[in-house]
Amino acid sequence: MKKELKDLNKHGFNSIQAAEIKAYQELIDAQQALHANPRDERLATVEKEASNQYKQKQEIYVQFLKQKAKCHWLKEGDSNTKLFYRSIKQRRLRNNIYAIRDMTGVLKDSPGDIAEAFQQYYAQLLGTSMQDREKVQSSNLEAGPLLNDDQRQKLLGDPTVEEVKAAMFSIKGDKSPGLDGFGSFFFQDNWDIVGKEVYKAVSSFFNSGKILKELNTTFLTLIPKVNCPRDVSEFRPIACCNTVYKCITKILCSRLKNILPDIIAENQGAFVHGRFIVHNIMVCQDLVRRYGRKNTGPSCMIKLDLRKAYDTVKWDFVREMLLGLNFPHQFTEWVMECISTPMFSLILNGTPHGFFKSKRGLRQGDPLSPLIFVLCMEYLLRTMRKMTEDKQFKFHPRCKAMALTHLCFADDLILCCKGEPYSIQEILNNFHHFSKVAGLTANNSKTKVYSCGMKEEVINNIIEQSGFKKGSLPFKYLGVPICSKRISVSQCEKLIEQMTARISTWSSKNLSFAGRSQLINSVLLSIHQYWAQVFVLPVSVLRNIEQICRAFLWSGVWYSTAPGYISWENVCKEKKVGGLGYRDIQKWNIATMARHVWAVANKQDNLWVKWIHSVYIKKGDWWGYEPPKDGSWYWRKVCETKRVLIHAGLKDTLLNMRRFSVKAIYQQLITNQEKVFWASNIWSRYNVPKHSFCLWLAVQQRLPTADRLTKWGAQMQTTCGLCGTGQESSEHLFFQCPFSREVLEDLKSWLNSRNTQQNIQGICKWINRRSKQAKVERAAWNLALSAATYHIWQNKNAVQHGKPKQGREHVVAQVKFQICQRLQLINVTKLSSREKNLIDCLNSS
């Protein structure tokens, strides 16, 4: 198919931007000809064809730019071509490598030398095998469950057509493609054509156990791990795997993920269904509650940083683990064929370099790698579990009941024990055994030892023997600070920095109000959401977050103190009650923390809940429980959240929840507010988002018209710039100004309407009364109202800034075009013949 697809790209999708510009010009010419001869049916047909061609070319062009820009937060809205161009430029500047130090520290600054430095580094990193590797000890594996016959059977068998299709459609279409350049969108959109061939290719692998080498040839793209990388080691290699290969490994993953919860220990929190990252964080938070205090028992915790974890896993170790856990031989061979046969090329500054084979490692970017890595880390846990049979080994305080010796989330590893030499040495000895078996070693410069109640001499001996560094609290674990005292404002600075840094990467010139609004909802508040699942954040931090979001929405920067057009309290209301649908982050914080209250009440089967019942509640009643004074600060905050929820009358709600819903709790925490009748008109799914935002301000009379600006102290001309007669106000601009009246009258005539309302709210009421059953009519009127409001406002602003005023015909033509364009989003198969005729009439008139 490669030749045919290349021809399609050359003749069908070449010069995408030029084709879009040409189609737009042809549409303008056709519309001008039709305007001069409105009764000419041939010109009407030509205009309709030109309109369809332009829509098609524009959609292709926008999708092309969006894929290059990698704006994953932007799901819908305007074409945003300026934003995409800027994002593409920023990505190139950020990802291009102009100079780098090689493995020996020599600076390389020519393209050829840079490529050679990276090839040598990764050929050595991935192409080096371990000569004196120890083998997996079966006695250690027996310290945990092995696969039974039913589980083994679930892993085997040829995939069905439905299984292959489900695997392909589970791959996100906007992910970077592999060496062949075909992303999953191609296969999904053309499944009726290529589905059988994909199924044959996938089935061939499961039947033969061999994979075509072309399917397992991989691009490695290098992602910087630091802001300004200087050495070849400061990059993370991400594999861009072939899409058909991903389909194969997705099938293996779908079978394997159902087995993992039964064989992976509960203190491994990553990539196992039903386990969450916050569980490890919260247990760790409780472990350090006495660190930093005087007169406390000896405790030791080691935060291990694994050096190049995924890249150094030994393949022999993977095979021994799978077979040792009683995985079927055939399944083991499928996995080994996938991970041990890839060939690599490096992508540097957009160009492929080199072609080499690896001898170890799991590819980051391969769907199978995380699950295999979890199985590898299971050996460490079982080794540690075997170690605890030694009666001389002493657990970390509070850990004996659960036999807890470490916490693991992927390659983030914490080891803990009592702060005495023998126990610490046993922990280190068993980790060194794991290193010799798996190939995973500690990065001594980044591994930290934390302690309390220990003699300085003992600590220094451990540091000297291990080569690790001495650490102090607070420290960062899984993205958040771990501290023995209540989290402070200064410890939340990282959260604020993440938000402001993200805003700084965007240009407000390329983002409309609607674009900023979507960025706040999709990105900024999501950054806060992760922290809000773990901590009850300080009120001052939450207020700071609100200030940042408010400044960005109204000013496009994070540091502005200028007032907004609408109060933040009203902005954070739901759309149906007149707001923008942002969350009240203080109440959202309570709602997210309510998950832990619910989990404890329902005794959920996870590590943290077991820890809480073991250490604190024991056999007591949770709803009547009060935390001890010496309990950790975070546990007291969880109990405080419980009291808030009880006071809000949500105890019964939590008890009756079979599955926890943050949204349901949040809905009950926010005050009941009266719905506004105009919300459905403004936020119609067919409206252009930036038009909706403008109309949202206009319907509340919050647009910065001259009369409002002068009240705020602005010195300016108050005469309407569109007519030059009346005083500019919201009422005058949209309904009393002769220019605006003519625009609205033309649209009324075009839509065959007799509406006589003279304000936006009145028109909304009229639309809602007239078109409850007529979907197309309602959508057309909502589109007309929002588009007319937007273009009149933009025209006024253009005149105010010295630009020429657009004529009435031009504004009306723009509104009509956008109405017809957006009506194409309606599924015509579900429309009545009358509504189909209405769309045809609007397109042809």
Predicted regions and their residues:
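Helix/loop segments that flank and initiate small ligand/metal-binding modules
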Residues: 581, 637, 641-727, 791, ...
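Family-specific functional microsites
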Residues: 708-845
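Basic, alpha-helical interaction scaffolds
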Residues: 1-11, 465-539, 557, 582-606, ...
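Arg/Lys-enriched, amphipathic patches
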Residues: 1-109, 157
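Short, conserved micro-motifs composed of acidic
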Residues: 397-398, 442-473, 544, 563-564
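Conserved pre-motif C helix in the palm subdomain of viral-like polymerases
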Residues: 2, 9, 233-264, 282, ...
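Surface-exposed loop/turn segments and immediately adjacent short secondary-structure elements
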Residues: 69-233, 247, 481-482, 671-673
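Short, conserved non-catalytic motifs in the polymerase core
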Residues: 97-110, 148-153, 164-186, 218-244, ...
